[in-house]
Amino acid sequence: MGKIIGIDLGTTNSCVAVLDGGKARVIENAEGDRTTPSIIAYTDDEIIVGQPAKRQAVTNPTNTFFAIKRLIGRRFKDDEVQRDVNIMPFKIIGADNGDAWVESRGNKMAPPQVSAEILKKMKKTAEDFLGEEVTEAVITVPAYFNDSQRQATKDAGRIAGLDVKRIINEPTAAALAYGIDKKQGDNIVAVYDLGGGTFDISIIEIDSNDGDQTFEVLATNGDTHLGGEDFDNRMINYLADEFKKDQGLDLRRDPLAMQRLKEAAEKAKIELSSTNHTEVNLPYITADASGPKHLVVKITRAKLESLVEDLIQRTLEPLKVALADADLSISDINEVILVGGQTRMPKVQEAVTNFFGKEPRKDVNPDEAVAVGAAIQAGVLSGEVKDVLLLDVTPLSLGIETMGSVMTKLIEKNTTIPTKAQQVFSTADDNQSAVTIHVLQGERKQASANKSLGQFNLEGIEPAPRGQPQVEVMFDIDADGILHVSATDKKTGKKQNITIKASSGLSDEEVEQMVRDAEAHADEDAKFEELVQARNQADGLAHSTKKQVEEAGDALASDEKEKIEAAIATLETAIKGKDKEAIDTATQALIEASAKLMEIAQAKAQGEAEGQAHDAGQEKPADDVVDAEFEEVKDDKK
């Protein structure tokens, strides 16, 4: 059985870990980094992921996608999406089904399709480390993700060629990473998770007793559209406003300038966590009729804190709600864990310390803890980790729309999962032969104010006066937090089942098509990699052969020289094309054409070696320098 890997699919950065000798290990990617920027770029002939994609973003802003997680499982008309439409350098569009999609070079793509490229990079990173194929994964999501967002994340895994064995909440994963080595006692832990695009708070009880550990989530709350990207956007808007005041030009209309501004804002924000002031200096940021313009703005930590103060305050209300839902007071919290890169900001740490009345722990890596926890959960599923029980919850209430456009809840928020619930409903009209089951997720009484997860009809109900037919609706939430619904006419036994997909979302056919596309791209990518290797080898051969021709001088006959130069020219032409076979053929032709060169080079090397040996024999040096002179002869031979 192959390894199950743990993946933290983050808004800003992603991370992959695996159990290695019973311990979770974060795996370095091909660039040698332990985290990978969640950035995907589409060029003419390839898809670039991670740090290489980030490096080229300034020159390719409209085809470089970041923070895609903020769009996953969302509708285009959502207020949060509309805010992003106005500030992102790439194009966010409404799909035919109403979902938020993106567009690159005329191709429309669903967020799970784009996110799958990051998951593929994580999969390849793990495979390179393990030396074997990886097909199974545990993927983390924000605790406050709704059903649509969880389903979309599983879809991304399928498109990437992964069987997603479990979806696990990020704060729960962080608690696993923190608590797995705490062998005794009962601890109540608050996990404050402020990442790149989402915020979660989870109250978790860790019970360690005689080697058995139970991680029970007591309550969770959060905001799926609040994170480091919003902090960056405040800084971006401030810099753009300052530039407009100074120069009268609005940088928001220039995607290239906005991409440079984004990078500078993120860098300045990070610097201000360890220093009190910094300067953003972007020469040639734009130009007008009078010439090029430069942006130079000094910014202090105090200014940044004033720009984001309300964002930090927005994280505190969910803390109060989560404590109330868990029926706990602040004094009941034993430890506070910070997760997510944005928690490195001193003002965030100060706000959390003031709220809980205690310093957060510093021994949890905010960038890696979630992936480590996912790897531990993977170990639990594979049987490698024993005596660990994880009890997670559903973050939002689930129910159906009933008469008067009211949401009737079947499963309350913070219910431990997996779970089932059923309730009997009846008809609203006389002789009604069908009922529509409209499934909702949220906390509002008014049905329309909640998230619609989908609807289906139960038909064939026998005509009867209103209120007499009995329809049993059953909700079943699996361990991934994904909902399955059935409705049964108790008299006839007729039943209708669905696994809830959002009223939008991707159909199975669309996901399968994307899986096939991804597999086709994998072949394309492999061929492209082979082409690049062939080009590089050929280029190196052409360069070294030219040098050898020069060094050979008159020792090389003119007809031989012409033959070699013609072969070099043919190879250089082939390198510019995209035909690997043509490059390989031209490479072999040059190797054969330059056989005479090799003879000349070998003869020259042999002559030099004999000359040096003769010189060494003529001169009898002292014993203590013989070894050094012998070394010199060897080096020359090389």
UniProtKB/Swiss-Prot annotation:
Keywords: ATP-binding, Chaperone, Nucleotide-binding, Phosphoprotein, Stress response
Residues with PTM Phosphothreonine: T198
Pfam families according to UniProt: HSP70
Region feature Disordered, mapped onto this chain: 539-559, 602-638
Induction context: By stress conditions e.g. heat shock.
A molecular-function term among this protein's GO annotations: unfolded protein binding
Biased composition regions of type Basic and acidic residues, renumbered to the chain: 611-623
Compositionally biased intervals (Acidic residues): 624-638
Entries under PROSITE patterns matching the protein: HSP70_1, HSP70_2, HSP70_3
PANTHER family registered for this protein in UniProt: HEAT SHOCK PROTEIN 70KDA
Known function: Acts as a chaperone.
Sequence similarity: Belongs to the heat shock protein 70 family.
Protein name: Chaperone protein DnaK
Organism: Shewanella frigidimarina (strain NCIMB 400)
